[in-house]
Amino acid sequence: MDEYEAQLLVVEQALLVTTDEQQREELSALRTNLEELLALTRSSETEATNNISTAQTNGDLDDELKRFQSELNDLKEQEQEETDTTDDKQQLEELRAKYNALLGEKCSAPHEHSWGALSYHNALICGVDDELIIDGNGILDVRLRVLFTNPTHREMLPCNYYLEGECRFDEIRCRFSHGALVPGASIKEYNAPDFHKLARNCPVLAKLQDRLWHRGRVLCVNFVEQQCRVRLDGQEHKERERDFPFEELFPLIADEDDELSSDSSESHSTEDSDAANDSDMDDLEAARQARMVELSLFTFKPTEKLGAWEQYTRGIGSKLMANMGYIHGTGLGSDGRGIVTPVSAQILPQGRSLDACMELREAANGDKNYFSVERKLKRAQRRQQAANEKAYARESKRTDVFAFLNGSVLGQAQNSTKTTKTSNLQQHSNKTLNVETVRIADDIRRKQRDIAKVQQSLARNATDAQLQKRLNGQLRAHQQELATLQAQESSLSKEQQTRKSKNKMFAF
């Protein structure tokens, strides 16, 4: 528009200067066109300005309307939130009031094991959590804190220090339970123990010294004294058969085997087609295998694998057992509660009675190889016998006056003995003979004292035949040695007397 005005100004100046009529007409026509163009331009700008102002006015109104609507929506949402919060608080208070009335009550609460299995156990409600939860159906609920009364695993065992309020660890760091949080909707009625249904082979839970409840089976029941003898499952217990009072037992009346059998009977009665029956049987078999696998987690894990000897064979035994439905790691039998460790053959000592074998087993004091006691005794006896033989051989090689006297007195050939005796005794001096005489006299007195002690022992133990036999043997040995010593003393005295008489004969 400024350009048009500048052009109009130039045209007007040219009209003032130009005198030519033709040029003035052209310039006049050009001025008229420029004026019309300027007028049109000004009118279009005015309309555009009006439109812009109108649009701005309409935009401001729309924005104001939007802000007003958003404020209304915010107010509605705030009111809804306040209403929901009020409803949640009211519902939370109602749930708390409902569950606070159950504090201290017994119930049956679920417990999820570390391997994913879920089972119900008797528990005691000890608290209500402050937070609301939403279950799978979208319903608000509250979690309850429960303590299990029959814990079967360490993570279920209540902490004694927590119960007394003195535990220094929090719920995560403590090895024992500070209470399990379970949804209130999952709580069931308390399963009270019925001791009247206790019978032989009835499954029970028994409380041991570790405060855990172990599975076992009833052997016999005494309802008068309220005691029950139970055989504990597994082989980690040294004493598998124990007596428990009723307070330390919990009967397991509803067994899983009965549930599986009832489910199978119902499925057979309700299903008509063979395909449906087959599918039900497959489900039951899968459930049985799952239960067997779960049961294997509770059983004792032996160090020796069942069927480990088949590494030297073709393994036909394990293949046959697998075809019959055996699952490795579980016990024998249809319910998987049989033995897990294979029975090993025990070689008894030859020529020994069963009573002697039992005595050896008691002497071993729980040793696996209790016949090692007998081997140790025999080994010590052989060592002692070998030592005695070596000592006897060493003593037999020694040659002294006593050996000479024994040979001279106890020899078989009398003539040769007398000749040797006289010749050998004549080789010793009088001093040596006197010393030997004193030694033999001391040995004779010592043997006489030993014989007197043995005779006193015989008189004191006249009723014990075995001891009498042994003492009589000792007495005979002492008497024989005494006779030998007396014979040696007699020989020495004769030699000394001979020498004295010779000295008298040569004395003038």
UniProtKB/Swiss-Prot annotation:
Localization, UniProt: Nucleus
Biased composition (Polar residues): 486-495
Domain of life: Eukaryota
Comp. bias (Basic residues): 499-508
SMART domains: G_patch
UniProt keyword Metal-binding, yes or no: yes
Disordered: region residues: 258-279, 486-508
Gene Ontology MF: a single term: zinc ion binding
Domain G-patch: 313-359
PANTHER family per UniProt: ZINC FINGER CCCH-TYPE WITH G PATCH DOMAIN-CONTAINING PROTEIN (PTHR46297:SF1)
Protein name: Zinc finger CCCH-type with G patch domain-containing protein
Organism the protein comes from: Drosophila grimshawi
Biological classification of the source: Eukaryota, Metazoa, Ecdysozoa, Arthropoda, Hexapoda
